[in-house]
């Protein structure tokens, strides 16, 4: 059988008609795949919208026995957002009686226990969870009010007494509250002026003996409270003075005895 061969057949180059046919078949396959993917996406979107519509609560006026397919497919994003908003919990509206009882309970205790909350919830016909949430919100409001009142109070004080902070700090915490401690202490013999006749410490005589004749030179007011030393220091100080005074008395007694014996000897 004689068969003619073209140069394209010998070289293995495909025919132009076959190339066009292959390209057409490939394009049709790709288009079919794209259509299938879009159809799947549309089905998933429709199913999702149907689920959202089923989950959304309906109003009594909008309740119907069935939903048409056109309504299901034509649901817009605004409707979906409305459904999401409807999922949120509605705010609890309290009656005047309920608010009155809640405020009375809050005045008694800001942190009521579970039993008190349950009793109050039964009294005002509310769930215990709602009562607990009300107390949490009321405590937060109370804290905010306390902070605002404290800030206003301090602001008013600063307006009325602008230098009250400085004067209080300077009077309560002076730079040198006891300037006489830096000076040299007197001798032990002069400490007898510190005591009354009953043996108690006299702070005024102590300050005067140390050289402060007037408190106005120190810019200090006379003490309104009796000055006292710490218990241990007072005992040590009094013991020291008593030993010094007793030794002084012994020395004076020995001197007088020696003088008397000498006088007696001279007279004899």
UniProtKB/Swiss-Prot annotation:
CDD domains: homeodomain (cd00086)
Primary location recorded for the protein, binned into one broad class: nucleus
Gene Ontology CC annotations of this record: nucleus
SMART domains associated with the record: HOX
Pfam families, A to Z: Homeodomain (PF00046)
Keyword Protease tagged: no
DNA-binding interval(s): 87-146
Coiled coil stretches, renumbered: none
Gene3D superfamilies: Homeodomain-like (1.10.10.60)
GO biological-process terms attached to the record: positive regulation of transcription by RNA polymerase II
Gene Ontology molecular function, alphabetical: DNA-binding transcription factor activity, RNA polymerase II-specific; RNA polymerase II cis-regulatory region sequence-specific DNA binding
Location of this chain's protein in the cell: Nucleus
Keywords recorded for this protein, A-Z: Developmental protein, DNA-binding, Homeobox, Nucleus, Transcription, Transcription regulation
Region: Disordered, residue numbers: 56-87
Family: Belongs to the paired homeobox family. Bicoid subfamily.
Matches recorded under PANTHER family: HOMEOBOX PROTEIN, PUTATIVE-RELATED
Protein name in the entry: Retinal homeobox protein Rax
Organism taxonomic ancestry: Eukaryota, Metazoa, Spiralia, Lophotrochozoa, Platyhelminthes
Gene of this entry: RAX
